[in-house]
Amino acid sequence: MRIKPVNIVNRYSPGIGRIRMRVIEDASAASLHPFVQDCVEPGSTLHTDGWQGYSGLDKKGYQREITVLRGRRKEASTLMPRVHRIAGLLKRWLLGTHQGAVAPQHLSYYLDEFTFRFNRRKSKSRGKLFFRLMQQSVGTSPKTYVTLIGRTKSAKQTAQQVGVW
């Protein structure tokens, strides 16, 4: 089984305020630009690396501060510490909470959960946090367990076919 690599984009505010994450097809402008337009107000300054996928955002109303990472003696984590901190926290959370067992088809849900938790990490009102979680769950259509885990048959049906049940 081959797993296609998945790119994750994040956006942060100064001092790491709120973040946004999304699974994208690749790191091309066709994939990056819609994410930026959905999550960042025009007129904002984007701090990016020198990747060409970000080219053209200036024509869409964004200023761009570029930090070229390739060929620099400093580590990327020193040049863009907030982005690397978020990436590290996400990796640690996925490995610790889910023991690394993250299926690509469920990655967007994991990113949503991580983003929800991160953006509310300093919430002083746990009741409001619960209220927001309930609001989001009520606004989403239900899914069966079989749909969630990506199986077409239930475990019982599979066990019966194998002769275990």
Residue locations for each model-derived region?
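Residue-level recognition of single "structural anchor" positions
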Residues: 1-165
